[in-house]
Amino acid sequence: MSYLVVTIKVILITGMPGSGKSEFAKLLKERGAKVIVMSDVVRKRYSIEAKPGERLMDFAKRLREIYGDGVVARLCVEELGTSNHDLVVFDGVRSLAEVEEFKRLLGDSVYIVAVHSPPKIRYKRIIERLRSDDSKEISELIRRDREELKLGIGEVIAMADYIITNDSNYEEFKRRCEEVTDRVLKNG
């Protein structure tokens, strides 16, 4: 009896708010990857369980306090279900506990890709993108960055297997994303 063994590759996208994580995820989806946006998974739970007036970030913090630091990763893997994709992407990894949980649940073919943009560029993008949960005040954006860093996102970025710098035009960013994706798919 023989078994068909299919190896999937998993990309964990990390980066500060406004760095270009979602754009990278969109490009990966266009290449056929299954993409799960971690904040969407949290938002789904938030819509059911949040306390009145509770901010999304505070809700996520409370989830981690109750269920452990890897809870969002576990919820995302549950959301994945049975996937027949060769490449699975989790957009928005914020802590090493999440990275460890993904590796525990999905095996060793897990790669961290950090998207980096300078703060001035990120803040400009955030102010222009018009997401409902984005602040338009620089002081609030700086506070949000600090909250992300307290969660451990800086440690995840430091442990990245690949870093994509997003400080130029879209075509250059796309080229850099394609280069990293090809390297992950070819060699890991």
Swiss-Prot record:
Question: Which controlled-vocabulary keywords does the entry list?
Answer: ATP-binding, Nucleotide-binding
Q: Which InterPro entries does the entry link to?
A: NTP_hydrolase-rel, P-loop_NTPase
One Pfam annotation reads: AAA_18
Signal peptide position in this chain?
none
What CDD domains is this protein classified in?
DPCK
A GO term, aspect molecular function: ATP binding
**Protein name according to UniProt:** UPF0200 protein M164_1169
Family affiliation: Belongs to the UPF0200 family.
Give residues annotated as binding ATP. Answer: 15-22
